[in-house]
């Protein structure tokens, strides 16, 4: 007979060992303080956990991992890769150590439709909702991480998540002073050092804090280039009395300086470049890994032909934009997060989580060849230009940097007022603010040709930082590739009731959230009518046309002058759930939730001049919406943790880039619905002491409900009835870990990812693959060195060759509607070996 009792906690109160369940995995302090759940405790073993599997109690499908498992994985690895062992999540890593980023798919939803949160604050970009997995917290500082595969919390401050939530939380400082230092070495010249120092309790009020820093540098696993990452972190925690109240303040600063990877092109479905009857109909177009002399190591160009610099001669840089040294992805990110809980009176609790985030990043191809006498450089002048290469003439075409810089200042607040009506009924009201100032610029910058065969950008952010690095035209105007400012403001109100019935066997949660989302768009350049192209110039336009558009010089292309627009979106979204406990350690649960994703910034900057009213507008893109249904069963004993669920999702108003016949261009628009059903299973078992087994299975059947129009001729992509791209229908994972003695422990794990469609019409796919990883640790505690160990990790043990990320297309068949060029894909990292030595004090 199991010995059962209730344990109540808030997520901010950390426990020893592997206590991670229910509210401990909630996103915000408010959700943590609200999700008071039952934990099964079984004698001396503590809360139910079996290896990777951790008992959950919430009325939604959630899978959680903790630091004990995270620490067995490769040092410095992105937390998304570590979570990839859980069901429902497909994460494809772009390199063996995680600093190049990767791609998220969760029950078929891409990363921009999945909310990624850090101590409850949203991390998805405010403009296009992208998740940058290479900028996440050092894994050694993460206490726990969880995946809600279907629904968000009722107070989740998101205007983008239609496909679930990924959340992680930081370590709490310890009461005792101490810390550790560690160093890692690995393949591809991998070098990483990290340290953490806990102050212990300081001052008269039991204040605790920790400081941490890390530095990582390694070579790309293919091609030429390196990846460098520096991160600093700190946290301070102040308990307020002995009732769970506290104030905490924490923050990271992360700096990435990476060379990009280039994925190989894939074969066409016919194996030839052209459609039947065309000149290229018999030209082979096979997978580039088969035709390139570099094979699976195909990447950006390794050489650069030195451009000539000759006075009186028209020198032209004929190199492509694919030289490795000019393909970079720099970013500076940081945030400050506050978490707090205050008991106002018996049964009344207030939680307040404020935050500020900063982002400075650059991406894209970032370069162009600019003629020295171009109109951009002449500006309002009829003749002349700028001598860019210093050879004394204005005849040349010189490569310059054209960055796509994004600078975001983001302010957030997530607060809850929680009222315990009595022992079995609880009411919460919550308010969330997410305000982002999104500045997107592209000030041209210079390229350093001091070594003409190995050029480098003078500054990774172009002309943003230094005046001397800018390209200035004859009018004194700094050339720009883009210039716009966007404000994204979310005000959200939510209410939740939680009640226990039938002698606490039944827990019911009834919630609703009301997001009010506003986008302010300020375009400072001229927008090409019915296009996303812009012209940033000091050149004076011709007199305005009757419709308000303008032209330049003798050209007939119409542009819309700089403008400002405002768009608003709102909705009422229910979030319901129930859990029923019965028997010994058994329960069933069900949930229903609705979500929305407002149109992204880039969708809204494609504008036209309405031919009837002459006002500036664009096709009315409505928010995407989803309805998620979950039903699950859980079984927990002292040695077994099992969770099984079935689900259905209705995804409506799906936004894709399609042809609009009125605009005669491609724009983002709502094209229909996706219906998905599936099942997920996870199980952990500890058959004997020190042996842990874990396994998962995920099944997904998703179907597009509509076709969509491709071009002015009315060609249609036959997508109705097809499956979603990049989404495996089957995934399996397993892990075995065993502690042989007090000195040595090891684990081996594998993840199988099924076939994935490359094209919307499902005429091309990539093969399934299996990646096996190994970890082994030698612990030196028996030598009196508690917390000191040597760990080895081998990723992709069997050296599987596979495609990771995919550049999808409408079709892979030349001559078919929607075909443009061969698709491409990222290459999975080969076998990689690394070692980490940690010394604790």
Q: How would you label these PLM feature ranges?
A:
Residues 596, 743, 751, 755, ...:
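C-terminal beta-signal and adjacent terminal beta-strands/loops
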Residues 37-74, 103, 145-147:
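N-terminal periplasmic "start-of-domain" segments of outer-membrane beta-barrel proteins
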Residues 72, 78-122, 150:
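Extracytoplasmic beta-strand/coil segments of soluble accessory domains associated
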Residues 237-239, 244-337, 362-406, 452-486, ...:
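Acidic/polar loop-and-plug regions of large Gram-negative outer-membrane beta-barrel proteins
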Residues 164-201, 211-223, 749:
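Short strand-turn segments of transmembrane beta-barrel domains in outer membranes
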């Amino acid at each position: 007979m199991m010995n059962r009792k209730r344990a109540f906690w808030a997520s901010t109160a950390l426990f020893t060992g592997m206590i991670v369940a229910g509210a401990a995995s909630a996103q915000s302090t408010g959700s943590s303080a609200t999700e008071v759940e039952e934990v099964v405790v079984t004698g001396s073993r503590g809360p139910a956990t079996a290896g990777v599997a951790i008992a959950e109690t919430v009325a939604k499908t959630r899978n959680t991992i903790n630091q004990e498992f995270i620490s067995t994985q490769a040092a410095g690895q992105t937390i998304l890769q570590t979570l990839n062992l859980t069901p429902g999540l497909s994460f494809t890593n772009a390199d063996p150590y995680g600093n190049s980023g990767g791609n998220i798919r969760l029950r078929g939803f891409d990363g921009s439709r999945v909310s990624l949160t850090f101590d409850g604050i949203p991390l998805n970009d405010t403009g296009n909702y992208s998740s940058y997995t290479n900028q996440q917290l050092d894994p050694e500082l993460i206490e726990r991480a969880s995946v809600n595969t279907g629904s968000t919390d009722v107070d989740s401050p998101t205007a983008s998540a239609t496909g679930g939530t990924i959340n992680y939380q930081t370590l709490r400082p310890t009461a005792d002073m101490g810390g550790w230092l560690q160093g890692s070495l690995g393949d591809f010249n991998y070098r990483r050092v990290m340290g953490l120092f806990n102050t212990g309790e300081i001052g008269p009020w039991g204040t605790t804090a920790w400081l941490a820093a890390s530095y990582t540098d390694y070579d790309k696993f293919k091609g030429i280039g390196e990846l460098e990452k520096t991160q600093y972190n700190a946290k301070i925690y102040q308990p307020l009395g002995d009732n769970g109240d506290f104030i905490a303040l924490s923050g990271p600063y992360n700096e990435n300086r990476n060379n990009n990877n280039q994925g190989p092109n894939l074969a066409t479905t016919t194996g030839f470049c052209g459609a039947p009857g065309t000149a290229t109909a018999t030209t082979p177009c096979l997978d580039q890994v088969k035709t390139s002399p570099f094979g699976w190591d195909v990447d950006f160009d390794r050489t650069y032909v030195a451009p000539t610099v000759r006075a009186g001669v028209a020198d032209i840089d004929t190199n492509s934009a694919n030289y490795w040294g000019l393909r970079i992805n720099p970013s500076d990110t940081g945030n400050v997060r506050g978490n707090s809980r205050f008991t106002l009176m018996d049964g009344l609790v207030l939680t307040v989580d404020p935050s500020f985030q900063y982002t400075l990043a650059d991406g894209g191809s970032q370069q162009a060849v600019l003629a020295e006498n171009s109109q951009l450089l002449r500006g309002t002048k009829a003749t002349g230009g700028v001598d860019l290469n210093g050879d004394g003439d204005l005849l040349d075409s010189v490569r310059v940097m054209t960055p796509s810089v994004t600078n975001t200042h983001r302010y957030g607040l997530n607060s809850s007022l929680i009222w315990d009506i009595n022992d079995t009924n609880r009411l919460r009201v919550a308010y969330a603010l997410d305000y982002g100032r999104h500045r997107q610029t592209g000030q041209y910058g210079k390229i350093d040709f001091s070594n003409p065969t190995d050029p480098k950008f003078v500054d990774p952010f172009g002309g943003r930082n230094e005046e001397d690095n800018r390209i200035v035209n004859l009018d004194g105007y700094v050339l720009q590739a883009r210039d716009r400012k966007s404000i994204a403001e979310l005000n959200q109100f939510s209410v939740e009731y939680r009640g226990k019935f039938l002698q606490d066997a039944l827990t019911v949660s009834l919630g609703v959230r009301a997001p009010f989302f506003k986008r302010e768009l300020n375009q400072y350049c001229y927008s090409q009518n019915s296009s996303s192209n812009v012209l940033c110039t000091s050149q004076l336009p011709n007199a305005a046309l009757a419709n308000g558009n303008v032209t330049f010089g003798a050209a007939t292309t119409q542009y819309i002058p700089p403008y400002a627009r405002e768009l608003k979106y709102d909705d009422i979204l229910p979030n319901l759930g129930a859990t029923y406990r019965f028997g010994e350690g058994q329960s069933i649960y069900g949930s229903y939730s609705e979500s929305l994703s407002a149109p992204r910034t880039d969708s809204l900057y494609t504008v036209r001049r309405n031919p009837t009213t002459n006002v500036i507008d664009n096709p009315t893109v409505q928010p995407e919406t989803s309805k998620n249904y979950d039903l699950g069963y859980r079984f927990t004993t002292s040695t077994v943790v099992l969770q099984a669920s079935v689900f259905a999702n209705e995804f409506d108003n799906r936004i894709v880039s399609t042809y609009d016949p009125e605009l005669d261009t491609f724009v983002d628009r709502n094209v229909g619905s996706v219906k998905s059903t599936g099942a997920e299973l996870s199980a952990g078992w500890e058959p004997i002491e020190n042996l842990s087994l874990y396994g998962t299975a995920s099944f997904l059947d998703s179907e597009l409900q509509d076709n969509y129009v491709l071009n002015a001729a009315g060609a249609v992509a036959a997508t109705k009835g097809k499956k979603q791209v990049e989404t495996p229908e089957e995934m399996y994972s397993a892990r075995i870990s065993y502690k042989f003695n007090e000195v040595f422990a090891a684990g081996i794990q594998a993840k199988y990812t099924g076939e994935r469609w490359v094209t919307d019409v499902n005429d091309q796919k990539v093969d399934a693959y299996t990646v096996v990883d190994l970890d082994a640790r030698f612990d030196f505690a028996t030598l009196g060195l508690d917390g000191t160990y040597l760990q080895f990790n081998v990723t992709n043990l069997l050296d599987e060759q596979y495609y990771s990320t995919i550049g999808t297309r409408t079709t892979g068949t030349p001559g078919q509607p929607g075909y443009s060029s061969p698709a491409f894909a990222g290459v999975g990292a080969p076998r990689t070996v690394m070692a980490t030595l940690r010394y604790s004090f």
